[in-house]
Amino acid sequence: MKYLLTLCMGFFMLLSCNNKSSQSAAIATDEPEVNEDTLFRVIDLANNLKPCSDSLLLSDIVEDVEYVKLEAADNALVGEMYKGYVSDSAIFFSCIGSPIRPHIFMFDRFTGKFIRTIGKSGQGPGEMYSPVNVVAKDSLVYLSSDYRDELFVYKIKNGEFVRCIPLNKPYASAWYYYIGDNRVIHFPFYNVWDGKYSMCDMTIQDFDGNIIQEQTPEVDYTGFDYRNKPNTGFAVAWAYKNHPNVYSFFTDTIYAAFDDTIRPRYFLSLGKYKRPLQLKVSAEWKNYIIFHRFWETKDCLLGSFGLEQKAWFFRYDKKSKEIKTWKQDAEGLKASFPIPPAYEWIIGSAAGIINDIDGCSDHLRKMDYISENQFAICITQDNMDEIRKIVSESTNVKFPEKRQQLLELIDSMGPDDNPILAIYKLKD
């Protein structure tokens, strides 16, 4: 009996040891959680400009779509969206047109019912001309103007003016900005002439205009003077996991704001395709990479750019570090007047991404961010016929029921109706 008891105890001890070894092996083979906040990645784009044969699909970055038809109230007839923002409960919409119109039209987030206008044109308290962008946070909405170096703040519930927030580094910052807790994150690029241009990729400031942190690149100022400003363009900015990101034209680095700290996340190696900052706008620009937009999910970074008068996309896989690129024929910029030769490199339109979500497409480059993780296509009287044709011919989609819903909404549009917003949610 004693021998049998000893044998059983030994058997259970052996079983226990084997179980612990198995658990240890399982733990050892699990992949650690990746902390995006601390990673820095190098993307060698210059040596990977070899178009791949894979399809460039919208489902790679988008998980869902919904549609909101904006109510055509008498005092809320709008056209093509200029800028928009979608909160949890409302849609804030500014449209292309007269700068003296009401600045923002507010609609219900889900029904599209018109609620009110926000902002007045003029030069009195709380009044402004030419709104540029709109961002909503909590109970307030923040508007910018292309002629005032400050943000105008209004209450969402009644449109009442609250205050102005001075922008410490004003140039170009009104185009893109993010609102935090007593923080404005914006992207000035360069300030007014003061012996030399003050370069700046990203600024974090408080609501009183005090700078908390800024990213200022080291730039060769040779050749710059008050007549020859650096050619940077406007910010290519986006948010990922609620952290504002911006691509620096100066250093080809992507920076992100983490609370009151600015850190680099990516370096894009452009090699011979790097545009010299001192090169004035000319036909030569077609020989250099000009970035248009970025989208980001937990799996990849997707970017669009122009090169040699072609439309390009690249996809960087965060896990495998694989870089894929796509090249598309593109149309030049169209206007009612002859385009000067110096601007013929600008891309007007291209095929863009294949929309396998619902078939709707007005080219990916026209999909405008309307919140930190959503972008939209605005379907208007002007483009509805083109979009209807595209959607009707798109049969291989992830959400056929959404495709049918979209077709029915387009068919229901009358000559005086407001636009339909197709709102796409990024993965993550």
Per-region residue spans from a language model:
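Repeated scaffold domains used in trafficking and secretory/extracellular systems
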Residues: 79-83, 127-133, 170-179, 224-227, ...
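Short loop/turn segments that connect beta-strands within beta-propeller blades
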Residues: 108-111, 155-159, 206-209, 258-261, ...
